[in-house]
UniProtKB/Swiss-Prot annotation:
Subunit record text: Component of complex II composed of four subunits: a flavoprotein (FP), an iron-sulfur protein (IP), and a cytochrome b composed of a large and a small subunit.
Catalytic activity: a ubiquinone + succinate = a ubiquinol + fumarate; (R)-malate + a quinone = enol-oxaloacetate + a quinol; (S)-malate + a quinone = enol-oxaloacetate + a quinol
PANTHER family documented for this protein: SUCCINATE DEHYDROGENASE 2 FLAVOPROTEIN SUBUNIT, SUCCINATE DEHYDROGENASE [UBIQUINONE] FLAVOPROTEIN SUBUNIT, MITOCHONDRIAL
Entry's family note: Belongs to the FAD-dependent oxidoreductase 2 family. FRD/SDH subfamily.
Record pathway: Carbohydrate metabolism; tricarboxylic acid cycle; fumarate from succinate (eukaryal route): step 1/1
Gene3D superfamilies from the UniProt entry: FAD/NAD(P)-binding domain, Fumarate reductase/succinate dehydrogenase flavoprotein-like, C-terminal domain, succinate dehydrogenase protein domain, Succinate dehydrogenase/fumarate reductase flavoprotein, catalytic domain
Membrane-spanning intervals of the chain: none
Record carries keyword Cytoplasm: no
Subcellular location field: Mitochondrion inner membrane
Keywords: Electron transport, FAD, Flavoprotein, Membrane, Mitochondrion, Mitochondrion inner membrane, Oxidoreductase, Transit peptide, Transport, Tricarboxylic acid cycle
Protein name in UniProt: Succinate dehydrogenase [ubiquinone] flavoprotein subunit, mitochondrial
Length: 665
């Protein structure tokens, strides 16, 4: 159902001055088409009103809501309909239609200790996640996530998610990397609930279908520009309607950032082109910190030459990695877990095989993932999407030949720092402080449940658990219909000025050229293995690229569906994420999880955990690296770093914290 506000219809018929010339801007939307927002069952936005306080060149509309969610992937949808279900007047702003969000690309599954394949316990899942994080994960948040996991999966089942089934009718659970029984002593766990190899697709459509039951107002194809901050509080967001070029200020008591990751900072990645770190950059521009951005996960099995994801579920179903000699080489690197070691371990092992001359193909620059020893019926029922993807992108029939694969950027462990309730935090004078009115969840956030390395199938769990946590936290502290905090009349003025500047900029370098330079710099200088000299050179190169942003050239001077402008705004966001990633990596003088330094090959904790700690002198906070990086970027692109302690305590005595130890599989 589309509708048109009276104030909105008047708005677009006003005369606008664009780029120094007066143009008559007739209404681009009529009652027969979508105007300012698209709603299936959402409330009619009677609060929308015209404003000329920040621009006489662009139509500006002000809206009031109890809560605003930015992003409509798995985390954003779960937060949005959770808020609407609790009675909050909620807006969900998204730059693309909800079911086109990148959650749709997740393949393998969602972890939960249901115990359908063997006895399982959420505390074992907790242990595996802490170990997988290389002891950089916050154990209170990991406790919350893993304890909530079984109920979250059952909730999805009740929403209608069509999980794969065992012969007994239970939810089928496959093996995934880094998952064990009995605190690592009971063998491989089967904990990953799946819908064949299209779990993300099913999850996203299930959540979107569920969301239509509630009174959520969806603002589809709206590009969020910046947070509206007043006196250290978040009071909403400002966004561009890409369909007609109008500017919208959303005033709200609570704002949830669920904008996903920033995989497109790298040249080769599994991320959609829309994964541009928009929320992460918005927080950075607001003067707030980001956390642990140097930890970037390289998925072991991206299709060679294409980067498309081949799910870890392939190895969970029995697939193996082989080198040019036909050797199952993971037996040498992870004697127990083998091909189901954690992703950082497998990616490094593959890279070493290639470096030492045992790569496959004429250039010996990749390895093979072998599936053809598995029954064709198993491939057809459990991995149908992979069979199709391998044929399209690699020309491989998986029933007869192996898939050429190479580690590819896949996930960002770092993000906007939050506590386990989803509240965004800063670190002031040695203490965590909540940013009033601001929440984050999903890949955009760092709770930190993934620490230095995420376990496969914990990401979809992260989405639903912390999307729900944001809604619950807001419902605990606020009531629907409470007065919306005020904003300054000129709030968002800088955002509109930046947009206008980019729209008419006429420098010498195209957006696409700058973007590819940034991506190749990140790919070449912050890859699977890193060294100080290469990272330092990468920092210098990236800062130089960032300094040329003022010399950028755009071509489209229009305002309706100006994709040139939107891609340039996305490049600004990517650049802020890339700068913090590479500077954080250069500063971290150790190897931990996905951050592997060849010049600092060991993990540096407060104690040497390879030996008994009795008699050891505890290192001071400044001497060890078991701490979170907090990064800031000023208006000139200068990165500054601080650090905050890892939380080692759990929520209660139901779960005992896991002390650091040597991490092996």
């Amino acid at each position: 159902m589309a509708f048109l506000n009276v104030a909105s219809s008047r708005l677009l018929s006003k005369t606008l001055q664009l780029g120094g010339r007066v143009q008559n801007c007739t209404a681009t939307c009529t009652a027969a088409t979508r105007n300012f927002h698209f709603s299936v069952y959402g409330r009619k936005d009677t609060s929308a009103k015209l404003s000329d306080s920040i621009s006489t060149q662009y139509p500006v509309v002000d809206h009031d809501f109890d809560a605003v969610v930015v992003g409509a992937g798995g985390a954003g949808l779960r937060a949005a309909f959770g808020l609407s279900e609790a009675g909050f007047n909620t807006a969900c702003i998204t730059k693309l239609f909800p079911t086109r969000s990148h959650t749709v690309a997740a393949q393998g599954g969602i972890n939960a200790a249901l115990g359908n394949m063997e006895d399982d316990d959420w505390r074992w899942h907790f242990y595996d996640t802490v170990k997988g994080s290389d002891w950089l994960g916050d154990q209170d948040a990991i406790h919350y996530m893993t304890e909530q996991a079984p109920a979250s999966v059952i909730e999805l089942e009740n929403y209608g998610m069509p999980f794969s089934r065992t012969e007994q009718g239970k939810i089928y659970q496959r093996a995934f990397g880094g998952q064990s029984l009995k605190f690592g002593k009971g063998g491989q766990a089967h904990r990953c609930c799946c819908v064949a190899d299209r779990t993300g697709h099913s999850l996203l459509h299930t959540l979107y279908g569920r969301s239509l039951r509630y009174d959520t107002s969806y603002f589809v194809e709206y590009f969020a520009l910046d947070l509206l901050m007043e006196n250290g509080e978040c009071r909403g967001v400002i966004a561009l309607c890409m369909e007609d070029g109008s500017i919208h200020r959303f005033r709200a008591k609570n704002t949830v950032i669920a904008t996903g990751g920033y995989g497109r900072t790298f040249f080769s990645c599994t991320s959609a082109h829309t994964c541009t770190g928009d929320g992460t950059a918005m927080v950075t521009r607001a003067g707030l910190p980001c956390q642990d951005l140097e930890f970037v996960q390289f998925h072991p099995t991206g299709i060679y030459g294409a980067g498309c994801l081949i799910t870890e579920g392939c190895r969970g179903e029995g697939g193996i990695l082989i080198n040019s000699e036909g050797e199952r080489f993971m037996e040498r690197y992870a004697p127990v877990a083998k091909d189901l070691a954690s992703r950082d371990v497998v990616s490094r092992s593959m890279t070493i095989e290639i470096r030492e001359g045992r790569g496959c193909g004429k250039d010996k620059d990749h390895v093979y993932l072998q599936l053809h020893h598995l029954p064709p019926s198993q491939l057809a029922s459990r991995l149908p999407g992979i069979s199709e993807t391998a044929m399209i992108f690699a020309g491989v029939d998986v029933t007869k030949e192996p898939i050429p694969v190479l580690p590819t950027v896949h996930y960002n462990m770092g993000g906007i720092p939050t506590n386990y309730k989803g509240q965004v935090i800063t670190h002031v004078n040695g203490e965590d402080r909540v940013v009033p009115g601001l929440y984050a969840c999903g890949e955009a956030a760092s709770a930190s449940v993934h620490g230095a390395n995420r376990l496969g199938a914990n990401s979809l769990l992260d989405l639903v658990v912390f999307g729900r946590a944001c809604a619950l936290s807001i419902a605990e502290s606020c009531k629907p219909g409470e007065p919306v905090p005020s904003i300054k009349e000129n709030a968002g003025e800088e955002s509109v000025a930046n947009l206008d500047k980019l729209r008419f900029t006429n420098g010498s370098t195209r957006t696409s050229e700058l973007r590819i330079n940034m991506q190749k710099t990140m790919q070449n200088h912050a890859a699977v293995f890193r060294t100080g000299s290469v990272l330092k050179e990468g920092c210098e190169k990236l800062s130089a690229i960032n300094s040329t942003m003022d010399d950028i050239k755009t071509f489209d001077r229009g305002i309706v569906w100006n994709t040139d402008l939107v891609e340039t705004l996305e490049l600004q966001n990517l650049m802020l994420c890339a700068l913090q990633t590479i500077y954080g990596a250069e500063a971290r003088k150790e190897s931990r999880g996905a951050h592997a330094r060849e010049d600092y090959k060991v993990r540096i904790d407060e104690y040497d955990y390879s030996k008994p700690i009795q008699g050891q002198q505890k290192k001071s906070f400044s001497e060890h690296w078991r701490k979170h990086t907090l990064s800031y970027v000023d208006g000139k692109g200068k990165v500054s770093l601080e650090y905050r302690p890892v939380i080692d305590t759990t929520l209660n005595e139901d779960c005992v914290s896991v002390p650091p130890a040597i991490r092996s599989y």
